[in-house]
């Protein structure tokens, strides 16, 4: 019961708690806590100011990310990032926080480079690699096609 990470957006959270999206958004911290009480594990309440809550009382607000992330597949990419971090033996809460931060920073870098409109989940891949590997030196081919800077 405690070995899970739940990653709802506000609409999914509202369905899980039997309330309205407005109620979820009116107090995101309380909503994450309510989800945690009901489902245990770690809760990642996605959205503006993503809330990560763990059963041990830890709570983090991830302020990275932007409105361009409100597109199909973004949650799948986030889950994949978190899963990869779990595969590297991070604890649930730490993997959720690190995954949300990397995901959000990659989206912010991408938005600064090409704008938020029309952002696709697959657009994050090349930027994400550079976000999690900041010391990698880019080649001329990288710079001409998909520069991080």
Whereabouts are the PLM-identified features?
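A general alpha-helix detector
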Residues: 12, 31, 80-81, 106
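Short, small-residue alpha-helix embedded
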Residues: 15, 71-102
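Short, well-structured alpha-helical segments that form the helix of a local strand-helix-strand
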Residues: 28-36, 92-106, 121-129, 144
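Short, well-ordered loop/turn and helix-capping segments at boundaries between secondary-structure elements
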Residues: 22, 76, 87-88, 130, ...
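Active-site proximal loops enriched in glycine and acidic residues that flank catalytic Cys/His/Asp
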Residues: 8-10, 45-47, 54, 63-64, ...
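Short beta-alpha connecting loops at secondary-structure transitions
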Residues: 16-17, 62-69, 79, 83, ...
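Glycine-rich phosphate/dinucleotide-binding loop and adjoining beta-alpha-beta core of small-molecule
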Residues: 1-64, 135-149
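Charged C-terminal helix
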Residues: 105-149
């Amino acid at each position: 019961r405690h070995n899970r990470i739940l990653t709802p957006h506000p609409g999914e959270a509202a369905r899980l708690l039997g309330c309205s999206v407005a109620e979820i958004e009116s107090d995101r911290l309380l909503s994450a806590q309510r989800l945690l009480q009901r489902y245990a594990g770690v809760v990642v309440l996605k959205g503006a100011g993503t809330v990560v809550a763990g059963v041990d009382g830890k709570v983090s607000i991830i302020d990275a990310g932007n409105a361009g992330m409100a597109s199909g597949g973004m949650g799948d990419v986030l889950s994949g990032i978190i899963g990869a971090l779990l595969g590297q033996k991070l604890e649930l809460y730490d993997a959720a926080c690190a995954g949300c931060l990397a995901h959000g920073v990659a989206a912010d870098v991408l938005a600064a480079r090409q704008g938020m409109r029309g952002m696709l989940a697959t657009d994050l891949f090349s930027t994400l690699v550079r976000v999690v590997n900041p010391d990698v030196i880019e080649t001329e081919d990288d710079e001409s096609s998909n520069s991080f800077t």
